[in-house]
């Protein structure tokens, strides 16, 4: 009888020890996750105040934005596909493509606006390859490259309420910008 009680006590002790180890493992997992997960990076670039984010009728003139290129503001109800747009494609797009692209920004996209005309050394193809390389590295998710003739710099990146100017395009900074700014917007869960 005593032997049976001793075995029962030992079994109970082993069960409680197993439960205790399991609880400690779960607590350890939560602590490890909290320490391992870095805080979200602060968005990069100059802050651009947005007066309104209202939808306007498709085809209507969105008017002047608070920055050039825009970092937010009034926009159409539709977006443009996330991709690299060549200068030759702009003429086939609907009127005021910026009003579609501002809606992309509201959905958390990052846009690299580029102007090859300001490059004096004929390095447009290299610039486009570098921008495309960044798009490829982030799998093109919520990233657009778009030609913009009014730029005084070769590239300006915008995200919702942010503007970052590149005097010389740096792919590493561009990648960091995408990671820091993507989805920091009013509608980050929209496609």
Enumerate the predicted regions with their spans:
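Membrane-interface motif at the C-terminal end of an N-terminal transmembrane signal
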Residues: 27-39
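Hydrophobic membrane-insertion alpha-helices, especially the h-region
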Residues: 17-30
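Surface-exposed, low-hydrophobicity interaction/linker segments
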Residues: 38-100
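Short, well-ordered strand-loop elements centered on a beta-strand within folded domains, enriched
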Residues: 77, 123-128, 156-157
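Terminal, Lys/Arg-rich, intrinsically disordered segments and adjacent short helical elements
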Residues: 1-19
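Mid-length scaffold segments of soluble, non-membrane domains
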Residues: 89-137
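Helix-rich interaction surfaces within compact, conserved domain-sized segments
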Residues: 130-191
């Amino acid at each position: 009888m005593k032997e049976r009680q001793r075995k029962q006590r030992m079994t109970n002790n082993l069960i409680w020890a197993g439960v205790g180890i399991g609880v400690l493992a779960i607590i350890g997992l939560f602590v490890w996750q909290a320490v391992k997960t870095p805080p979200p990076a602060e968005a990069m670039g100059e802050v651009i105040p947005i007066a309104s984010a209202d939808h306007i009728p498709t085809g209507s003139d969105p008017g002047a934005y608070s920055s050039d290129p825009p970092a937010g503001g009034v926009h159409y109800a539709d977006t443009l596909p996330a991709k690299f747009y060549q200068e030759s494609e702009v003429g086939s797009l609907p009127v005021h493509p910026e009003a579609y692209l501002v809606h992309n920004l509201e959905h958390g996209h990052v846009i690299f606006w580029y102007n090859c005309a300001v490059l004096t050394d004929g390095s447009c193809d290299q610039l486009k390859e570098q921008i495309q390389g960044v798009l490829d590295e982030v799998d093109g998710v919520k990233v657009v490259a778009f030609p913009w003739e009014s730029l005084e710099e070769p590239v300006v990146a915008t995200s919702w309420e942010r503007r970052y100017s590149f005097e010389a395009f740096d792919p590493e900074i561009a990648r960091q910008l995408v990671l820091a700014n993507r989805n920091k917007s009013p509608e980050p869960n929209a496609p």
